[in-house]
């Protein structure tokens, strides 16, 4: 019984010694491998390979946690910023609203643009977009409502810049405007010129007082020529007198009437 206990105790001691020796050998082997130049080089190469990814990830986290100054400025309330920053905010918003809302002049001339895809203007009608706050000709209601001043008096001080439709709807007003130059020549030269220009657009003997001319009556002859050139895209530089222009308008009006009668 005692011999068996002694053998068992000796076996346990041997087993413990083997475990300790194995652990010591493993520790020495591990320390030797970690201290070897090859292992150091492998570890260094591994860290260098992953360094760009770690740097990129860090930059991504920083950009996500810290927005750019333009983004933070655009998201701020205009009522809570100083005047200079508010002006910068409005400038950025106007720039963003105007993006691709007009055709590129360089692209229209030569079908090429040095800015390429970075151009703020549209390279073709397919790229055009409506602005966020349309004004002028871009407004959806541009030239959709009659101009009260022009409809009643046949004249408008805004001229071709008027945002409303210039259409004669009152026959009495048209007669008054067409004959005003004979009655008020000594009282108001400006009104006389306006009435005379109006008679150019309303040919004598015409009973159609509702024709849509879609533009006003310039007072000066040069304005009249430019307005007609813009509307028709024709060269009217050869017409040096108002009488020649009146004759030309008369012939154009008759031609339009003939075309409309053929269609009906």
From Swiss-Prot:
One of its GO terms (biological process) is embryonic pattern specification. Keywords: Cytoplasm, Developmental protein, Differentiation, Metal-binding, Repeat, RNA-binding, Translation regulation, Zinc, Zinc-finger. Gene3D superfamilies: 6.10.250.3220, Zinc finger, CCCH-type. Residues 61-74 have a biased composition (Polar residues). A zinc finger (C3H1-type) spans 98-126, 141-169. It comes from the Eukaryota. It is found in: Cytoplasm. Zn(2+) 1 binds at residues 104, 113, 119, 123. One of its GO terms (cellular component) is cytosol. Residues 56-82 are annotated as: Disordered. GO terms for molecular function: mRNA 3'-UTR binding; poly(U) RNA binding; single-stranded RNA binding; transcription corepressor activity; zinc ion binding. Zn(2+) 2 binds at residues 147, 156, 162, 166. Disruption phenotype: RNAi-mediated interference leads to maternal-effect lethality. Expression of glp-1 in all four blastomeres including the posterior EMS and P2 blastomeres, instead of only in the ABa and ABp blastomeres at the four-cell stage. Abolished asymmetry in neg-1 expression in AB descendants. The keyword DNA-binding does not apply. SUPFAM superfamilies: CCCH zinc finger. RNA-binding protein that coordinates cell fate specification and differentiation during early embryogenesis. Binds to a consensus pos-1 recognition element (PRE) consisting of the sequence 5'-UA(U 2-3)RGD(N 1-3)G-3', where R is any purine, D is A, G, or U, and N is any base. The PRE motif is found within the 3' untranslated region of many maternal transcripts required for early development. Binds to the 3' untranslated region (UTR) of Notch receptor homolog glp-1, thereby repressing glp-1 translation in the posterior blastomeres in the embryo. Monomer. This is RNA-binding protein pos-1. It comes from Caenorhabditis elegans. The gene is pos-1.
């Amino acid at each position: 019984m005692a011999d068996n206990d002694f053998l068992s105790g000796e076996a346990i001691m041997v087993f413990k010694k083997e475990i300790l020796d194995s652990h010591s050998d493993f520790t020495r082997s591990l320390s030797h491998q970690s201290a070897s130049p090859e292992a150091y080089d492998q570890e260094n190469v591994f860290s260098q390979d992953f360094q760009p990814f770690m740097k990129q990830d860090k930059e991504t986290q920083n950009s996500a946690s810290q927005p750019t100054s333009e983004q933070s400025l655009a998201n701020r309330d205009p009522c809570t910023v100083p005047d200079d920053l508010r002006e910068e905010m409005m400038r950025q918003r106007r720039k963003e609203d105007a993006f691709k809302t007009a055709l590129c002049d360089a692209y229209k001339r030569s079908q090429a643009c040095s800015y390429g895809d970075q151009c703020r203007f549209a390279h073709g009608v397919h790229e055009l977009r409506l602005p966020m706050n349309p004004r002028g000709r871009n407004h959806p209601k541009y030239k959709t409502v009659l101009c009260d001043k022009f409809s009643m008096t046949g004249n408008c001080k805004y001229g071709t810049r008027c945002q409303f439709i210039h259409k004669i709807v009152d026959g009495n007003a048209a007669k008054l405007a067409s004959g005003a130059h004979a009655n008020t020549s000594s009282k108001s030269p400006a009104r006389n010129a306006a009435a005379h220009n109006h008679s150019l657009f309303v040919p004598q003997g015409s009973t159609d007082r509702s024709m849509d001319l879609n533009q006003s009556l310039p007072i000066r002859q040069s304005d009249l020529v430019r307005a007609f050139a813009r509307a028709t895209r024709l060269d009217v530089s050869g017409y040096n007198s108002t009488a020649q222009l009146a004759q030309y308008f008369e012939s154009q009006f008759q031609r339009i009437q003939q075309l409309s009668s053929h269609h009906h």
